[in-house]
């Protein structure tokens, strides 16, 4: 079974990925889990309905397993749900020898990791992602919940014991969720590898390809790209910020939509178009943005921007971005495909880029 090793400064751990990963690691994993005093599984309503029975079968021989089922979507990454999970842990009597399993998409991984990082100052946890989007969020140790004023504003860096990535869960993902996760695959290609980007564009040309073409080698490559960056910079003091390409604008848009109007990958797609447009203006990026947007449209993405979204709100939310320091907004831009840079953007440039993007396609958000 394909295995990728993540070598962060704080911990080294494996990422197991294939269509039957849970079955393939079952014996070894349950032996490890049996050493803990209690297994606590955090999932959401959707995943519990579709896949709980599969995880139950894997955990069947363990004596003490407790589930917490969170709401679907970004609603799970709130103070209210975080407190409720903590209350459940305390009432259940979990001690420091317990372990948490985050079983779901990126939201559950973020919430579960943050719960594990903060309960009794830290208990071990495993990531068992069920979505394409989670190939990015499950690896690297970023864990967080949202604040009404910004995405992932309350969090930590806390690495899992392992990531068990069973791709057969993708079969039940709606097309919109598949597309959202695929956006992070595009991001990895843009910041690292022109050849990878071309392979994505040649392989995936319509929405049905998400289900009929093999995603696994592209997911593996994306995880390898992220693992290499995390090995250099676990806590985002330098090159790890490159993984935020498209996220400064994208997170601002998510916050404007109250973390519900757009899925993460949808917002990041707008953010990547925005960042590519600024990269053309600042660095003369040699990139066929028109071809790129046409490809995105073929895959079902909406690439046009809505003039009714007030720029003032987007700018305000960008100021709350974690990369903003000394009131200077940091953008991840591209000098060329595969060559990201950090650029301190003035308000005038941010607005001019917004206007340029609007001129090239509006009224769609």
Swiss-Prot record:
SUPFAM superfamilies: Dehydroquinate synthase-like
Cofactor(s), by name: Co(2+); Zn(2+); NAD(+)
Gene name linked to the record: aroB
GO CC annotation terms, alphabetical: cytoplasm
Organism name: Listeria monocytogenes serotype 4a (strain HCC23)
Pfam family, one: DHQS_C
Reaction catalysed by this enzyme: 7-phospho-2-dehydro-3-deoxy-D-arabino-heptonate = 3-dehydroquinate + phosphate
Keyword annotations from UniProtKB, A to Z: Amino-acid biosynthesis, Aromatic amino acid biosynthesis, Cobalt, Cytoplasm, Lyase, Metal-binding, NAD, Nucleotide-binding, Zinc
Its biological purpose: Catalyzes the conversion of 3-deoxy-D-arabino-heptulosonate 7-phosphate (DAHP) to dehydroquinate (DHQ).
Official protein name in the record: 3-dehydroquinate synthase
Cited PANTHER family: 3-DEHYDROQUINATE SYNTHASE, 3-DEHYDROQUINATE SYNTHASE, CHLOROPLASTIC
Pathway note: Metabolic intermediate biosynthesis; chorismate biosynthesis; chorismate from D-erythrose 4-phosphate and phosphoenolpyruvate: step 2/7
């Amino acid at each position: 079974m394909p295995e990728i090793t993540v070598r962060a400064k704080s911990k080294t751990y494996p990422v197991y990925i294939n269509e039957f990963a849970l079955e393939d690691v079952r014996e070894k994993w349950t032996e490890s889990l049996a050493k803990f005093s209690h297994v606590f599984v955090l999932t959401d309503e959707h995943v519990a309905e579709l896949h709980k029975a599969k995880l139950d079968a894997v955990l069947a021989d363990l004596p003490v397993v407790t589930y917490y089922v969170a709401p679907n979507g970004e609603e799970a990454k709130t103070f209210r749900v975080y407190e409720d999970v903590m209350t459940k842990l305390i009432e259940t009597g979990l001690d420091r020898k317990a372990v948490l399993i985050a079983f779901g998409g990126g939201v559950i991984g973020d919430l579960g990791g943050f719960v594990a990082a903060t309960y009794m100052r830290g208990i071990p946890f495993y990531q068992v992602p069920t979505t394409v989007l989670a190939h990015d969020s499950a690896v690297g140790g970023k864990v967080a919940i949202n604040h009404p004023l910004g995405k992932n504003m309350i969090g930590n860096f806390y690495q899992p014991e392992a990531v068990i990535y069973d791709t057969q869960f993708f079969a039940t993902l709606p097309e919109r969720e598949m597309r959202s996760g695929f956006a992070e695959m595009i991001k990895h290609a843009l910041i690292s590898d022109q050849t990878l980007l071309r392979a994505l564009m040649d392989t995936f040309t319509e929405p049905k390809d998400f289900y009929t073409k093999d995603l696994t080698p592209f997911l593996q490559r994306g995880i390898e790209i992220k693992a290499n960056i995390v090995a250099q910079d676990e806590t985002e003091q330098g090159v790890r910020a490159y993984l935020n390409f498209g996220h400064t604008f994208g997170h601002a848009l998510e916050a404007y939509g109250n973390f519900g109007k757009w899925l993460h990958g949808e917002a990041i797609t707008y953010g990547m178009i925005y960042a590519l447009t600024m990269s053309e203006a600042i660095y003369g990026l040699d990139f066929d943005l028109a071809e790129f947007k046409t490809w995105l449209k073929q895959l079902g993405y909406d690439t046009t921007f809505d003039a009714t979204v007030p720029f003032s709100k987007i700018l305000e939310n960008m100021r709350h971005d974690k990369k903003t320091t000394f009131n200077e907004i940091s953008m991840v831009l591209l000098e060329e495909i595969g060559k990201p840079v950090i650029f301190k953007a003035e308000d005038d440039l941010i607005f001019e880029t917004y206007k340029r993007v609007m001129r090239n396609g509006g009224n769609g958000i």
